């Protein structure tokens, strides 16, 4: 529509939520696919192809114009058409320019300058006014809402303390103190009455009829008890009595120790949501899956590379002796641990009922990672170590993984920005970067890293290299002489294509479910090579003895069979296919998968003879789901099996919910994770004894077990 009168009357509000990538999700269903922002208010909702929450908002509020965040086009509900014109202020043009800058901009990590962290959005101008008169540059990305909230809370505490010391404050506190005293007295009387009632009930209860108890009571009755007067205690001097009284320091220490002893996990370990920071659902789903893989999680709970990267990058450390350097590094690790693992608490709370373990809604249950990196040395291993400790501490229901996102932006530039990304590509890139980081750290200045730490790095590297590593046998058979040529190739996942009957885009194909075993059958089936393209060594070796003619090519067939099974089997279902030159469409066929997978039919003969039948069985551990109809848009969630609670969890960014295996089977799977069931000696054959001895839960010394607000 070239001209819409409703757009000409539009007045875009300042500080609209569309300018904040963290709010690019539907306020009703939390999806990030087909997001429409109302231009008359700050409401954000999904489009008509999802659940029509944007249309329902128009029907309730009569706000006509909405703006699509990803594709950046406007739509008028009253005109029922897309809008091409703009208002007099040029708000739509400015909005498109701003969103294009947000999506295409490279986001550097901001380093504090003069103890002030520069904010960007309109909300953080309040923080700047509160902190000082410094101007706010518009080209910085991170926000400081959490820091502003902390300063406001601290300022409120300071003013409240000052007010309580004043005459007016003390006078106002008298009625409150009287009510508290009366409340404590009533509670004490109620407790006494309850104790007296229970005592009376016990006295009126008839004796038990048990023969065993009667026999023991008769035996006890024959024992004569002679009372003996205890000698009086020696008189204590006044000085000793005074010294025996607890001091204020003793009372404080006892209070802290009692609180630590009584502390219980507030949520089930591992049931921690990850906030969507702007189209980061692909990262959140992959991180949830990796944290629920027991072997992978234990490795990174044990290993932290940050302090050793700092030592290796220091020029001054090279001049020190080996013992002095290692001692300083260890001291730096212990003293700087709390500082490096800094988080900011937020007042968000909540999980679905049944997962919080009785957590109080008033308690701070969200951790917000600092906007700047936790260390000047970017390390994905370090960020995984910190994140897994928080997620499996049982203390936090929600985490905002800013530091992890900034490390991904810095070390994997292809995922920089707020554009839609593919979870499978991100998983492959993340594992590749982690592997390279472990390899380079182990070989970088080995004299500065203790032997035990180098051994631990080697063990973790071995796990990362082998947990997903498998091998398949590529066998080519010459149809002229039946000679077979075998080649061993490695794989870290199996990309499975849909059978031919599901490749068409008709409704009949989409209505018929596909079995994951059918896709494995297609992967291992015998494939005929087109034409005479195979150069058979056997045929050419016989011909060269009797003739000098050129090389002869023959027809052949090829088959792939698995010869080495991985510890964790990743099955990537190739749902996206090219349609035309530049368009990739999704195959929306439902794939049927079971909780147990038998890989015996897909292995070669040598593997079948070498392994026991139980070694071919795999249990489903996690599933990554893609919601939506296209490659460039959609939403990722994950189903993960929580071994601590013994239940399945649906991880939808910050929203986590308990689910059944039937719900998992109904999901539209994109990546399947199966863990090998049988091991040789009762535990994982890839996990070293040093890692096995480590607890699954992080240490209570981490920041995850603290409710203190950190800057």
Swiss-Prot record:
Major subcellular location class: nucleus
Q: Where in the cell is it found?
A: Nucleus; Cytoplasm
The alphabetized list of GO BP terms reads:
antiviral innate immune response; cell division; chromosome segregation; negative regulation of mitotic metaphase/anaphase transition; proteasome-mediated ubiquitin-dependent protein catabolic process; protein deubiquitination; regulation of mitotic cell cycle spindle assembly checkpoint; regulatory T cell differentiation
> Which residues are the active-site ones?
281 (nucleophile), 635 (proton acceptor)
Zinc finger, UBP-type: residue spans?
2-99
Q: Name one GO molecular function term.
A: zinc ion binding
Keywords from the named record: Cell cycle, Cell division, Cytoplasm, Hydrolase, Immunity, Innate immunity, Metal-binding, Mitosis, Nucleus, Protease, Thiol protease, Ubl conjugation, Ubl conjugation pathway, Zinc, Zinc-finger
Protein modification: Dephosphorylated by CTDP1.
EC number(s) in its UniProt entry?
Answer: 3.4.19.12
**Residues annotated as signal peptide:** none
User: For Zn(2+) 1, which residues are the binding ones?
Assistant: 4, 6, 76, 79
Catalytic activity from the UniProt record = Thiol-dependent hydrolysis of ester, thioester, amide, peptide and isopeptide bonds formed by the C-terminal Gly of ubiquitin (a 76-residue protein attached to proteins as an intracellular targeting signal)
Note the Pfam families from the entry: UCH (PF00443), zf-UBP (PF02148)
- Tissue specificity as recorded in UniProt: Widely expressed. Highly expressed in lung, pancreas, skin, liver, stomach and intestine.
Q: What class of enzyme is it?
A: hydrolase
Under the heading Gene3D superfamilies, the entry gives: Cysteine proteinases (3.90.70.10), Zinc/RING finger domain, C3HC4 (zinc finger) (3.30.40.10)
Family listed:
Belongs to the peptidase C19 family. USP44 subfamily.
Summarizing the function annotation, the protein's role is: Deubiquitinase that plays a key regulatory role in the spindle assembly checkpoint or mitotic checkpoint by preventing premature anaphase onset. Acts by specifically mediating deubiquitination of CDC20, a negative regulator of the anaphase promoting complex/cyclosome (APC/C). Deubiquitination of CDC20 leads to stabilize the MAD2L1-CDC20-APC/C ternary complex (also named mitotic checkpoint complex), thereby preventing premature activation of the APC/C. Promotes association of MAD2L1 with CDC20 and reinforces the spindle assembly checkpoint.
How is this protein named in the record? Ubiquitin carboxyl-terminal hydrolase 44
The protein's organism comes out as Mus musculus (Mouse)
């Amino acid at each position: 529509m070239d001209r819409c009168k409703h757009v000409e009357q539009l007045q875009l509000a300042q500080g609209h939520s569309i300018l904040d990538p963290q709010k690019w999700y539907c306020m009703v269903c939390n999806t990030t696919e087909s997001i429409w922002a109302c231009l008359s208010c700050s409401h954000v909702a999904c489009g008509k192809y999802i659940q029509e929450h944007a249309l329902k908002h128009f029907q309730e509020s009569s706000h006509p114009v909405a703006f699509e965040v990803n594709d950046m086009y406007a739509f008028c509900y009253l005109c029922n058409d897309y809008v091409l014109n703009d208002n007099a202020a040029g708000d739509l043009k400015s909005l498109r320019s701003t969103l294009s800058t947000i999506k295409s901009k490279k986001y550097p990590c901001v380093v504090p300058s003069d103890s002030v962290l520069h904010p960007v959005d309109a909300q953080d101008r309040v923080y700047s006014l509160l902190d000082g008169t410094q101007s706010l540059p518009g080209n910085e990305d991170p926000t400081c809402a959490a820091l502003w909230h902390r300063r406001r809370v601290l300022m409120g505490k300071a003013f409240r303390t000052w007010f309580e010391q004043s005459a007016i404050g003390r006078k106002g506190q008298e009625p409150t103190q009287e009510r508290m005293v009366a409340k404590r007295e009533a509670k004490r009387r109620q407790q006494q009455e309850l104790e007296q009632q229970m005592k009376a009930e016990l006295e009126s209860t008839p004796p038990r009829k048990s023969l065993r108890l009667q026999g023991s009571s008769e035996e006890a009755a024959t024992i004569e008890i002679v009372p003996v007067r205890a000698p009086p205690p020696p008189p204590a001097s006044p000085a000793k009595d005074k010294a025996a009284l607890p001091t204020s320091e003793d009372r404080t220490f006892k209070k802290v120790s009692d609180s630590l002893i009584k502390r219980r996990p507030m949520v089930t370990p591992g049931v921690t949501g990850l906030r969507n920071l702007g189209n980061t659902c692909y990262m959140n789903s992959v991180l949830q899956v990796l944290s629920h893989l027991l072997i992978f999680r234990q490795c990174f709970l044990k290993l932290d590379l940050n302090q050793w990267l700092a030592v290796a990058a220091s020029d001054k450390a090279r001049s020190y002796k080996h013992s002095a350097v290692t001692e300083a590094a260890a001291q730096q690790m212990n003293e700087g641990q709390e500082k490096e693992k800094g988080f900011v608490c937020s007042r968000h709370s909540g999980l679905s009922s049944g997962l919080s373990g009785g957590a109080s809604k008033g308690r701070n249950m969200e951790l917000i990672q600092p906007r700047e990196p936790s260390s000047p040395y970017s390390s994905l291993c370090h960020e995984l170590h910190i994140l897994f400790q928080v997620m499996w501490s049982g203390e936090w229901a929600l985490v905002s993984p800013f530091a992890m996102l900034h490390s991904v932006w810095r070390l994997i530039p292809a995922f920089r920005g707020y554009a839609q990304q593919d979870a499978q590509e991100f998983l492959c890139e993340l594992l590749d970067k982690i592997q390279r980081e472990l390899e380079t750290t182990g070989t970088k200045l080995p004299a500065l890293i203790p032997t035990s730490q180098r051994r631990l790095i080697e063990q973790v590297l071995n796990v990362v290299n082998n947990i997903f590593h498998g091998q398949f046998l590529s066998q080519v058979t010459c149809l002229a002489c039946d000679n077979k040529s075998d080649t061993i190739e490695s794989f870290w996942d199996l990309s499975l294509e849909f059978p031919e009957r599901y490749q068409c885009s008709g409704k009949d194909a989409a209505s018929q479910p596909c079995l994951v075993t059918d896709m494995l059958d297609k992967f291992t089936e015998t494939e005929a090579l087109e034409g005479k393209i195979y150069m058979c060594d056997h045929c050419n070796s016989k011909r060269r003895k009797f003739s000098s003619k050129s090389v002869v090519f023959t027809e052949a067939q090829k088959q792939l069979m698995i010869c080495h099974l991985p510890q964790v089997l990743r099955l990537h279902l190739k749902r996206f296919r090219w349609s035309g030159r530049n368009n990739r469409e999704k195959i929306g066929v439902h794939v049927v998968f079971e909780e147990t997978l038998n890989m015996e039919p897909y292995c070669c003969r040598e593997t079948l003879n070498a392994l026991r039948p139980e070694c071919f069985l795999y249990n489903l551990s996690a599933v990554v789901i893609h919601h939506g109809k296209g490659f460039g848009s959609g939403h990722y969630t994950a189903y993960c099996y929580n071994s601590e609670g013994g239940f399945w969890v649906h991880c939808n960014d910050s929203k986590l919910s308990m689910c059944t295996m039937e719900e998992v089977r109904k999901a539209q799977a994109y990546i399947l994770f199966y863990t090998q069931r049988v091991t040789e000696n009762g535990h994982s054959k890839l996990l070293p004894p040093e890692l096995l001895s480590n607890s699954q839960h992080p240490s209570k010394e981490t920041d995850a077990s603290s409710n203190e607000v950190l800057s």
